Amino acid sequence: MNSPLAPVGVFDSGVGGLTVARAIIDQLPDEDIVYVGDTGNGPYGPLTIPEIRAHALAIGDDLVGRGVKALVIACNSASSACLRDARERYQVPVVEVILPAVRRAVAATRNGRIGVIGTRATITSHAYQDAFAAARDTEITAVACPRFVDFVERGVTSGRQVLGLAQGYLEPLQRAEVDTLVLGCTHYPLLSGLIQLAMGENVTLVSSAEETAKEVVRVLTEIDLLRPHDAPPATRIFEATGDPEAFTKLAARFLGPVLGGVQPVHPSRIH
């Protein structure tokens, strides 16, 4: 039986999942969090589904083995590649980023035309398209925006170059007259201002990060594992499988003073 004092485990292929960690911290400030950014193997978008599944489950094994009370797959590519395997494999709740965002988009749309942007792996997996299939009277337009992740990982989230890239990627969504757009990659909220500018103010952006954090709140409440308010102050541990210094520089933009330090993950621990 898991303890309410156990941490919530969160992982992503890099820094993008920190948008989810930030949202969880904002909504559940008392919770301990252990975050692993798989920068040594990411970004996952260009990888094959079997490669993504192998990397994601290795990190999931590590976090569950360390006693987390819930596992958050804070990566759309990993959610689409290994969610079923993870839920069969682990005896803790597994929260992913796709279905929470889909529910919010269906509730938000006014004309039934919904856009989804994500990595090539996420879009070609049809995970979002399949998740929307149960929603009546919706028309889905999905577009891969692979270079967005590269810009975010380099810390470039504004400027003419990335705006021009966004306008090119998003043009099919404008032609489809979508009124709701799912940011189907946890890196993309860092580009939300630029994406909103390109799409226009009448388009509602749905952040998978915010909706996933709400799902974590719901799940922990349902199984009575919320950390008590009178527990010791929350601790947050951030780890990277790649260069911790490079991770820290980028992560500070997501978390600010909440970040603290970033610890390296020895390759022998995740295999």
From Swiss-Prot:
Gene name, Swiss-Prot/TrEMBL: murI
Enzyme Commission number(s) from the entry: 5.1.1.3
Pfam families: Asp_Glu_race
Pathway annotation from the record: Cell wall biogenesis; peptidoglycan biosynthesis
Recorded GO MF terms: DNA topoisomerase type II (double strand cut, ATP-hydrolyzing) inhibitor activity; glutamate racemase activity
Catalysed reactions, as listed in the record: L-glutamate = D-glutamate
Domain of life: Bacteria
Residues annotated as catalytic: C75, C185
Annotated NCBIfam families: glut_race (TIGR00067)
Binding site for substrate: D12, S13, Y44, G45, N76, S77, T186, H187
Species of origin: Mycobacterium tuberculosis (strain ATCC 25618 / H37Rv)
Name listed for the protein in its UniProt record: Glutamate racemase
Main function: Provides the (R)-glutamate required for cell wall biosynthesis.
